[in-house]
Amino acid sequence: ACYSAAREITEKFAKICAEILERPDKLLTYASPENLRKTNIQLDSYSSERQRLFFNEAPAMLLPDSVMDELIHGTENRSYQEYLRKLKRVFQKYTCKAHVDLILYSSVISDYIMTGELSLGNVAHQMEPEQVKAHINYLARCLEENENFRLFVLKDTSNMRTNFPKPPSIFIDTNAVTIENSQRKPNENYHISMYPQMIEMFANYFDDIKQKPNCVELTAEELRRYL
């Protein structure tokens, strides 16, 4: 359960609840991974000019072309192949040039480099060490080439991660907010809202995370040091 006595938060929720009671819209709608791929919601999000992305696991974004090609050739599922091809084009054409704020746990970066575990389109992949290295280096290159692409790292400790529940991943663009709880079953973990006040509320929450004392911005060179 979550609660807040902060006046700013309660007033914001009061406005949302009042509007919802007047018209029976859902604040958050369940979305299956299959529907997300079919309706291009994830592709639209990565194509957005403004993105706020908080991953609680390895970042499923901006993989270099060579790695994407290997993943495409490594699956026999035609619909997933087509999804990966579209995702590759979106990364090439839009995501690398967009205004992106990306937040990751420091331990998540380290774990990804050690284990190579990556979920892409809700499909688990076991990445090779060279693929992980290429991915991290490409993210660093995007940081260098796009001044509007910024990476923030939450300096977490093993004690913090064990004593507190892992928050869901949050993806915010200009049109929607998507929440992914990777601790739940794959067919239960996506919820989406296109409700403007929900998008604004989560955007404010995201921006608040960036102000936390344990949240620091990383340069491209600092990211490469994880390797």
Regions picked out by a protein language model, each given a short descriptive name:
Residues 1-13:
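Basic, Lys/Arg-rich alpha-helical nucleic-acid-recognition elements, primarily the DNA-binding modules
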Residues 24-218:
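Hydrophobic protein-protein interaction segments
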Residues 216-227:
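Charged phosphate-binding loop/patch that engages nucleotide di/tri-phosphates or the phosphate backbone
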